[in-house]
């Protein structure tokens, strides 16, 4: 099907018709931390909810289209999210010192082509235009002494772009 444009663009030349393929996955992590221990700078245990279980869900879309230009030549285009994570811990959760929120999303936009050189040999290639965004938050700056907890809520955000290629 048309998703070959992302995984193996040479396979585009094997498609008999133009195609559109849409899909999605719903991801709800089920993670439990038991006996989580965190200490302040003086080594005193900090309090918090234990066991911890993060919340956070992700909808992961993908779409692929293939155009049969001729019997031996096809073009494709894919939009996929090859990597992502989304977890949320409460501000009073034991895991708050690691992260209260972690969200990383990547999108890959990929134009491709496939060409059938002979009956038993095809080539294909594609470009990958990637975009990544991240949002990571945590509680930091706990005080020392007697397990007292101060701290600030810190949010780190970032975005990036990259260009790559794949052949098959």
Could you say what each language-model-derived stretch is?
Residues 1-75, 79-80:
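N-terminal, post-signal peptide beta-strand-biased segments of exported outer-membrane/organellar beta-barrel
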Residues 20-24, 77, 113, 125, ...:
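Membrane-embedded beta-strand positions of outer-membrane beta-barrel proteins
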């Amino acid at each position: 099907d048309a998703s070959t444009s992302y995984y193996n663009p040479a396979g585009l030349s094997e498609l008999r018709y133009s195609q559109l393929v849409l899909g999605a996955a719903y991801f709800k992590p089920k993670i439990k931390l038991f006996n989580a221990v965190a200490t302040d700078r003086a080594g005193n245990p900090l309090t918090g909810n234990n066991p911890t279980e993060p919340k956070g869900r992700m909808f992961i879309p993908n779409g692929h289209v293939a155009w049969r230009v001729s019997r031996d030549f096809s073009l494709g285009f894919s939009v996929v999210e090859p990597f992502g994570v989304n977890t949320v811990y409460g501000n009073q959760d034991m895991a708050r010192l690691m992260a209260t929120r972690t969200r990383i999303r990547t999108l890959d936009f990929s134009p491709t082509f496939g060409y059938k050189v002979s009956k038993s040999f095809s080539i294909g290639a594609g470009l990958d235009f990637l975009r990544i965004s991240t949002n990571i938050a945590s509680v930091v700056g706990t005080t020392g002494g007697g397990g007292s907890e101060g701290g600030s809520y810190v949010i780190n955000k970032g975005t990036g772009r990259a260009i790559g290629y794949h052949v098959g």
